[in-house]
Amino acid sequence: MPYYTRDDNDVDDFDEFDPTPYSGGYDITVIYGRPIPPSDETCYPLSSGVDDDFEYERPEFTQIHEPSAYGDEALNTEYSSYSRPKPRPAFRPDSGGGGHVQGERPNPGYGSESGYGRKPESEYGSGYGGQTEVEYGRRPEQSYGSGYGGRTETESEYGSGGGGRTEVEYGRRPESGLGSGYGGRSESEYERKPSYGRSEEQEEGYRKPSYGRSEEQEEGYRKPSYGRSEEQEEGYRKPSYGRSEEEQEEGYRKPSYGRSEEQEEGSYRKPSYGRSDDQVESYIKPSYGRSEEQEEGSYRKPSYGRSEEQEEGSYRKQPSYGRGNDDDDDEQRRNRSGSGDDEEGSYGRKKYGGNDSDEDEEKKKHRHKHHHQKRRDEDDE
């Protein structure tokens, strides 16, 4: 039994429920009446008939009142003091606090807060070399640096604490560069750039940072040599990945992947991957398993396992895949007549259960495969 047994429309299903407003609705004019048009009896006039000398800005609506902080005169004085400094208004008594009009000197009431940039009279910095509130970079007249390592000369600017450096401009020579505390450096070292393990004879001119490079490489601008020998370093060369140096001396060449050097001396050739030398004499398309007698002719379609007798002719119309030359025409006739021995598309393999009338084809294939294997062994040597 499902949990919800009621209809979805029964939203308010209790006993004393009148469904009339939900089903039929109600008319608001029937229940509340029609709205009456505006008239002088029911509506206020648009402009209030109050005299003009009545001030709405006053906090209390009386003709005689105390001068308010929100009055026009006080507001004008307050707002004009923000943009440009004016003398203090006469009617405001001098308040004994820090609150003063900005831009004027505060009366030294309580606290006498020293404005930043003014010279403090004498403020004793407490703590570990606590500094007085002066401008950074100015020399304080008297800074009594208490704590360990506090210095009392005038040259000591904020130099308290263990090995604290004097805060001077970097590049100037400080007056006394003997660092108080531990680890003070001498003054001549701050004029140099920090040398990370570089020797001083490398410091003479601008050089790129040498990470472990020898100094004879450091004489002129060179590209970083990662393990290249120095005779390769003389001119701009492309990176040689295992090529011998006499190949690099002859000029710009494409990278040779296992090509012999007598292949390198000719003009532009396509990269030969393991081809023998006599194949590379002229521009030849890549031969996939073709014999060398096939390579000597002009443009031919690629022969996949064709015999050499077929390759001696010119461009043939239909590529024969693994068939002999003598039984080419009668094989085509038999395939057109649909004799069942369809050797088309067999790609050099005999179908199972086919006729064994082409043993000479097997001999040719075996001889071609043996010749291809012998040439590949020669290339490996």
UniProtKB/Swiss-Prot annotation:
Biased composition (Basic residues): 364-374
Residue stretches of biased makeup (Basic and acidic residues): 166-175, 186-237
Region (Disordered): 1-20, 36-381
Biased composition regions of type Acidic residues, renumbered to the chain: 9-18
Modified positions (Phosphoserine) in chain numbering: 339, 346, 357
Top-rank taxon, per record: Eukaryota
UniProtKB keywords: Phosphoprotein
MF-aspect GO terms: mRNA binding; phosphatidic acid binding
One Gene Ontology cellular component: cytosol
Record has Cytoplasm as a keyword: no
PANTHER family: OS02G0743600 PROTEIN (PTHR33971:SF1), OS06G0232000 PROTEIN (PTHR33971)
Protein name per Swiss-Prot or TrEMBL: Uncharacterized protein At5g39570
Species of origin: Arabidopsis thaliana (Mouse-ear cress)
Organism lineage string: Eukaryota, Viridiplantae, Streptophyta, Embryophyta, Tracheophyta
